[in-house]
Amino acid sequence: MKNSLIMVLLFVLQKGNSQELFVVTDPASNVPANSLGVNIMQSTFKEKFESGYNYHFMPEVTYGINKNIMARGTAFISNRSNQLVTEGGSFLVKYRFFSADDLNSHFRMAAYGRYSFNNSDIHQEQIEILGHNSGFETGIIATKLINKLAISSSISFEKAMDNKPNYPFPDAIGDNATNYTLSFGKLMYPKKYTSFKQTNINLMIEFVGQTINENGKSFLDVVPAVQFIFNSQARLDLAYRKQLLSSMFRTAPNGFYLNLYYTFFNLKK
């Protein structure tokens, strides 16, 4: 009986949330309570001003403390020094403070905070505490699911600090920014659910932007993606990030993401 209830839960989760598991942004929904998500995030970006590629390997674990609160830890590993080096990590907590459910739709809102530490060199004006800068970020996310379409948007404040011990933040560039995102996800397959074991195929497009508060310099990127979900537990993401416009100095704005994600449900029995 207990196993049957778990099966039903997985089916409901797949049917309701699969198309709002975005690649480069977080939705307002959380990892299910008492569940652990393991994500192997990889990105390869073309260097703009020199030959070669910037590779980042960022494993992360996410735990659902309860239905409204989740916590996440991420490690930062890159080839910035021409070899794979561990550069730091981050901790995130997200709190879902609003939820409204209907038969074929739901609306969620959440607030989050992230703190990161990083020892790599500071080499661009863009502030990115997920893999490049030490600092913190806090923001709000709103996500709407209507049938097979998910729409999510966020706004956040991000503050960069010194990359200790060797790289103080440069005085000549702004150290805080406003971030904004808009994401769309559409379930393309299956057309009709018959089992939680069905493979899901989602198409997504995400817009990611930032404005440095001190000087107004900005960028806007687009991220088209395809996503496969297997057996309601395993996920494969493939995405390409392309700079649409920018007035700030960025060393590697264009590149690919490959994410491998697995969720362990019902850890405490």
Put a short name on every predicted segment.
Residues S18-D162, D171-K269:
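Transmembrane beta-barrel domains of Gram-negative outer membranes and organellar outer membranes
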